[in-house]
């Protein structure tokens, strides 16, 4: 009999994983403060990593990688992409981005040097001079010059400003209490018809204890309810696809897709009929490349292969597609929720791939092979 503890009562994903484990008959749930467990389903920001793996005779597994915030906080992701040897030269799939600290945080400003970007060795270097240099260059050359400011730890569409005015963007950040990212806004996104609407794509990615990377075969488009236009950046319902914003502010929420969600099968049908292309060849190949590039760049820093405990983690990668069918990484979520209809299959995949590979069920050899819900990258 294997044992597990649950330290995060708010995760719907791990509530389902917990239910599935108990249903096998091979797992027993212990009190949350019991140190002698095989598996911890913990809180992402409060995990006692230093105390894991020290119980004699027990292999211990935890559902997060220590250090994964390098990918999952917006400012850290920008720094990773600019400083990682694997990404700095070859990354063409991440929008131009700058890390900006509010002036009240007393952060040193990195001076622009002929447009050449110095490495971000300091963890607290403000890049506003580089942003302004790029902004002014684009303005002189008549390029699209719309940017989006986002709180590094923000979620659900909070702490966001879209503007073509550099002063407005910097003033907005300077009145906040935390680091932000200013990122080039994708002004020409691929739009869904009918409705001329924006969307983003959520893909779920599972990394097991050996740092094998698995992409969940299903994904979801989060769609806007209102037509996309560039003449009013304050109209969040046409620019931001977050469910909470669409549900709260758009009278057309749910008009085109139930819950403003389109799944991959429907999206593939749309691409085939509207553009004569397939999801796999036009978009998923790019998504797989981006996911693998990001995760391989952090593997040396976060892998648990030589530690006394093991980790796995579910990530949510968010993408946008422009009108040229180029895929752009927007952000990575380290504790993603899941579309309601996908919970059972996604969570069963977590049990089968990430947990049973470390703690195999006693009857593993008699169990029939399961259909591939995750694709190994």
From Swiss-Prot:
Query: GO cellular-component terms in the record?
Result: cytosol; spindle microtubule
Cofactor(s) needed by this chain: Mg(2+); K(+)
Q: What class of enzyme is it?
A: ligase
Q: What does this protein do?
A: Catalyzes the post-translational addition of a tyrosine to the C-terminal end of detyrosinated alpha-tubulin.
Mention one GO molecular function.
ATP binding
Domain of life per record: Eukaryota
Name of one Pfam family that matches:
TTL
The subunit structure is: Monomer.
EC number(s) given by UniProt: 6.3.2.25
What name does UniProt use for this protein?
Answer: Tubulin--tyrosine ligase
Key word Transport present in the record? no
What does the record give as the organism's lineage?
A: Eukaryota, Metazoa, Chordata, Craniata, Vertebrata
Which key words are in the record?
ATP-binding, Ligase, Magnesium, Nucleotide-binding, Potassium
The record's annotation in Gene3D superfamilies points to: 3.40.50.11480, ATP-grasp fold, B domain
The protein's annotated catalytic reaction(s) are:
C-terminal L-alpha-aminoacyl-L-glutamyl-L-glutamyl-[tubulin] + L-tyrosine + ATP = C-terminal L-alpha-aminoacyl-L-glutamyl-L-glutamyl-L-tyrosyl-[tubulin] + ADP + phosphate + H(+)
| A GO BP entry | microtubule cytoskeleton organization
Limits of the TTL domain: 3-370
Q: Which family does it belong to?
A: Belongs to the tubulin--tyrosine ligase family.
